[in-house]
Curated annotation (Swiss-Prot):
Disulfide bonds: none annotated. It is linked to Defects in PDC are the cause of photoreceptor dysplasia (PD); an autosomal recessive disease of miniature schnauzer dogs causing retinal degeneration. It comes from Canis lupus familiaris. This is Phosducin. One of its GO terms (biological process) is regulation of G protein-coupled receptor signaling pathway. Residues 111-245 are annotated as: Thioredoxin fold. The modification Phosphoserine is found at residue 73. Light-induced changes in cyclic nucleotide levels modulate the phosphorylation of this protein by cAMP kinase.
Length: 245
């Protein structure tokens, strides 16, 4: 009698499950077996196993998936963070390459500021002992002479812009030949290279407007080809971009 009842229940269940997929049929059958079993005759451990089998998508699986998703998110974050570190390393590498390139192309000594010459001997020593590839621009000035202060200020800017050029200044009274450099011919520019005087300009401020700046002096010297090609400040631009980020 019991056997006939079970057979009838299974036939009824199979009839209801004919429109589900294979996995759905199996899960429904497991659920049905759990419900049709006598609860008093099934051990608790077996009922738990049957329950888990009838519900494959249980909470533990969901928790595992959530943990996996969180783990993947962390991995993605680490990848993004690593990409950013790689980008920073690439920038540092490029900057180092640019520095190396500048050093190779800009061979020779570098200065970057204006040298104050105190005596005639120091003036001669600077001209004679400097490397032959170095251009030396000397401003002979005197305090109180019109245009001398402005030219000294222009030299400060140009020395920073053209570090391969040695910019110097000396008072006319300290040259040992003050009678040759009276206030009438000041300010005077003397340009040397390889120990030789290659150009000179007396009363040079007459070439400028009443008020002039470093750019005016730069243009004037460039007209005579006395300055090298100005260095491209790519490294400074790169640093600014990194600071911005």
């Amino acid at each position: 009698m019991e056997e006939a009842k079970n057979q009838s229940l299974e036939e009824d269940f199979e009839g209801q499950a004919t429109h589900t997929g294979p996995k759905g049929v199996i899960n429904d059958w497991r659920k049905f077996k759990l419900e049709s079993e006598d609860s008093d005759s099934v051990p608790p451990s077996k009922k738990e196993i049957l329950r888990q089998m009838s519900s494959p998508q249980n909470r533990d699986d969901k928790d595992s998936k959530e943990r996996f998703s969180r783990k993947m998110s962390i991995q993605e974050y680490e990848l993004i963070h690593r990409d950013k570190e790689d980008e920073n390393c690439l920038r540092k590498y490029r900057r180092q390459c640019m520095q190396d390139m500048h050093q190779k192309l800009s061979f020779g000594p570098r200065y970057g500021f204006v040298y104050e010459l105190e005596t005639g001997e120091q003036f001669l020593e600077t001209i004679e002992k400097e490397q032959k590839i170095t251009t030396i621009v000397v401003h002979i000035y005197e305090d109180g002479v019109k245009g001398c202060d402005a030219l000294n200020s222009s030299f400060t800017c140009l020395a920073a812009e053209y570090p391969m050029v040695k910019f110097c200044k000396i008072k006319a009274s300290n040259t040992g030949a003050g009678d040759r450099f009276s206030s009438d011919v000041l300010p005077t520019l003397l340009i040397y290279k390889g120990g030789e005087l290659i150009s000179n300009f007396i009363s040079v401020t007459e070439q400028f407007a009443e008020e002039f700046f470093a750019g005016d002096v730069e243009s004037f010297l460039n007209e005579y080809g006395l300055l090298p090609e100005r260095e491209i400040h790519a490294l400074d631009q790169t640093n600014m971009e990194e600071d911005t980020e």
